[in-house]
């Protein structure tokens, strides 16, 4: 586990835009943004002890309930990515967070991914409270992020505004 700065969004995930991720428009295809964000979710889950080992050891797993992606600016093959994560809320079974994808060297915001993740009991495959070993670090992280400004992309809905 990386020791994060708890008073700021987690800055613990890096990636590079792979050639296979490029579409006919010459930029990263929309689906691969979600792939990159999913890898960042894996990194996040390890921060509160519910990574791959959690499922491998048949304790539990996490399921994504809902996602919302915004595309701010394109990235291209070979571009380095920096993905930060901010916890927006959590309860006994869920965590609500947002990933922010930046071009790692130019610094611009490329995309965001807001997610609701739920803890699942391995045996029953039903929702279950976070185990203590996950809830303690998750609560600490959420508390540290509570005072952070809410990103403007968080909580958005999709629709065409009527004039």
Name these PLM-found stretches.
Residues 8, 108-110:
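Beta-strand initiation motifs
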Residues 15, 94-96, 114:
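Short, small/polar residue-rich loop motifs at catalytic or cofactor-binding pockets
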Residues 105-107, 123:
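Solvent-exposed strand-loop boundary residues in beta-sheet-rich modules
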Residues 111-113, 129:
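A structural microfeature
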């Amino acid at each position: 586990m990386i020791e994060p700065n708890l008073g700021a969004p987690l800055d613990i995930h890096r990636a590079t835009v792979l050639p296979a991720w490029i579409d006919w428009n010459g930029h990263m295809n929309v689906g691969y943004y979600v792939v990159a964000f999913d890898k960042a979710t894996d990194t996040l889950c390890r921060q509160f002890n519910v990574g791959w080992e959690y499922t491998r050891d048949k304790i539990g797993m996490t399921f994504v309930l809902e996602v919302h992606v915004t595309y701010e600016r394109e990235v291209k093959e070979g571009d380095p990515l920096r993905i930060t994560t901010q916890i927006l809320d959590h309860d006994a079974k869920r965590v609500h967070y947002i990933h922010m994808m930046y071009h790692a060297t130019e610094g611009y915001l490329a995309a965001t991914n807001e997610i609701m993740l739920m803890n699942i009991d391995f045996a029953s495959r039903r929702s279950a409270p976070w185990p203590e070993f996950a809830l303690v670090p998750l609560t600490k992280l959420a508390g540290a992020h509570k005072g952070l400004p809410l990103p403007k992309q968080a909580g958005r809905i999709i629709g065409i505004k009527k004039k």
